[in-house]
C-alpha cells in the first residue's frame, strides 16, 4: 500500500516512541528524527482546539528553517493537547503538577486534540482530530501508583491511554483511540494516500 510514496524520504519529526509505533503500523518506511528545539508557545487567546495544529505547523517550520528539508523529504509533525474546562493540560513539569492534572481528569470527560502537518518542499497539508475520553474516579492511591510506576511526564495531560491507567480508568472513548495516543493514523493514512496520488 501507499506505493506512490516510495519516491519520498518520509521523516517523522518527533521523539515520541508512541508516534513511531503508530506510524510503523501503516507499513511504510520512514526515519524518525528529533525536532530542532522550539518553544511550544502559542498566541494568547488562540482557541485551545487550534493550538495543536498551530504547534504542528511551528515544528514543521522549525525543521525547514534549519535546512533539514531535502527535495525528497516528506515530513510528518504532530502535537497533541488535552483540554478540560476550556484549558489546555500540557506535559507536566513535575510529579505535583502531574497529580493535579490527574485529579482534574478524574471522574470526568475531557477532549484530546492532535494536529498533524505533512510537509514537502513548500507545500504543507494540515489537519486535526478530536476525541472525547471519559475517566472513572481515580483514588489518590491509584494516582500515586501510576505516577510512581509509569512517570508520564512526557505526555499531555499526564497519562498514556495505552498504559495501566488506561486499563483501569478509561470508561469510554468517543472518536479515535490512536488520536489519544498521539497520532490519528486513519486520517494520516488517507492524507498520505491522497498526497501520493496527486504529486
UniProtKB/Swiss-Prot annotation:
GO terms for molecular function: dTTP diphosphatase activity; UTP diphosphatase activity. This is dTTP/UTP pyrophosphatase. GO terms for cellular component: cytoplasm. It is an enzyme of class 3 (hydrolase). The active site is at residue 79. Disulfide bonds: none annotated. The keyword Cytoplasm applies. Its cofactor is a divalent metal cation. Nucleoside triphosphate pyrophosphatase that hydrolyzes dTTP and UTP. May have a dual role in cell division arrest and in preventing the incorporation of modified nucleotides into cellular nucleic acids. InterPro entries: ITPase-like_fam, Maf-like. It comes from the Bacteria. Belongs to the Maf family. YhdE subfamily. One of its GO terms (biological process) is nucleotide metabolic process. Its EC number is 3.6.1.9.
Amino acid at each position: 500500500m501507499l506505493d506512490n510514496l516510495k519516491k519520498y524520504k518520509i521523516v517523522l519529526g518527533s521523539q515520541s516512541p508512541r508516534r513511531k509505533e503508530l506510524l510503523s503500523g501503516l507499513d511504510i518506511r520512514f526515519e524518525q528524527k528529533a525536532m530542532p528545539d522550539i518553544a511550544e508557545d502559542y498566541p494568547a487567546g488562540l482557541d485551545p482546539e487550534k493550538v495543536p495544529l498551530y504547534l504542528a505547523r511551528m515544528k514543521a517550520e522549525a525543521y525547514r528553517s534549519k535546512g533539514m528539508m531535502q527535495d525528497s523529504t516528506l515530513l510528518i509533525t504532530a502535537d497533541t493537547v488535552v483540554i478540560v474546562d476550556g484549558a489546555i493540560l500540557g506535559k507536566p513539569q513535575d510529579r505535583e503538577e502531574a497529580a493535579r492534572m490527574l485529579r482534574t481528569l478524574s471522574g470526568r470527560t475531557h477532549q484530546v486534540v492532535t494536529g498533524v502537518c505533512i510537509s514537502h518542499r513548500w507545500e504543507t497539508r494540515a489537519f486535526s482530530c478530536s476525541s472525547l475520553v471519559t475517566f472513572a474516579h481515580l483514588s489518590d492511591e491509584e494516582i500515586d501508583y501510576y505516577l510512581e510506576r509509569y512517570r508520564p511526564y512526557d505526555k499531555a495531560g499526564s497519562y498514556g491511554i495505552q498504559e495501566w491507567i488506561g486499563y483501569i480508568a478509561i470508561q469510554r472513548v468517543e472518536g479515535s483511540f490512536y488520536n489519544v495516543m498521539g497520532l490519528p493514523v486513519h486520517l494520516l493514512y488517507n492524507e498520505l494516500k491522497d498526497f501520493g496520488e496527486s504529486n
